[in-house]
Amino acid sequence: MAASSTCSSGTGPATSRSPRGNPDLTVKVSAASAEHLRRLNERLGALVVGRRLYDMTNAWGGRHPLDLTTVVVTHQRPDDRPEDDENFVFVTTGIEDAVAKAREIADGKDVGVNGGEIARQCFDAGLLDEVHVDLVPVFLGSGIPLLGMIEDAPVELDGPISVTQGKGVTHLGYRVRK
């Protein structure tokens, strides 16, 4: 299992945590959200993220909270990570190579993609099969768009293939129409 979740009975908060991830990054979610995240995370064998997210999170304290090897797409390897290890692999040759490396690491399991720019690059390269969005009722007013400008927009989605109502969040899953 990529991440474990412990759920309380009823609708009270549950704790979603990773056995080897950073315990400071434990999140409290509803039982429904914890179950949704557990099911989704069980499918994953590796992650692909961009350098901006890697830097913003300070490398998640050394290990992604989902306890998966994380492939980081970057133009330049960080100075403090001269070698790849079980936690992070750095790819400087583009999104296709990063996803191929993540598929190799995932060993038959799904590859998760996180970060709007990386998701957009995957859309543009035709690499996404599903999209999972966590809809939270908050308008931020500014910031980085979730996906930016997709080259072959509009991208049509089938579904939803999953809908989970958590507390203050709706988890939605769609298949990418190819």
Predicted features and spans:
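Enzymes that bind and transform nitrogen-containing heteroaromatic metabolites
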Residues: M1-K178
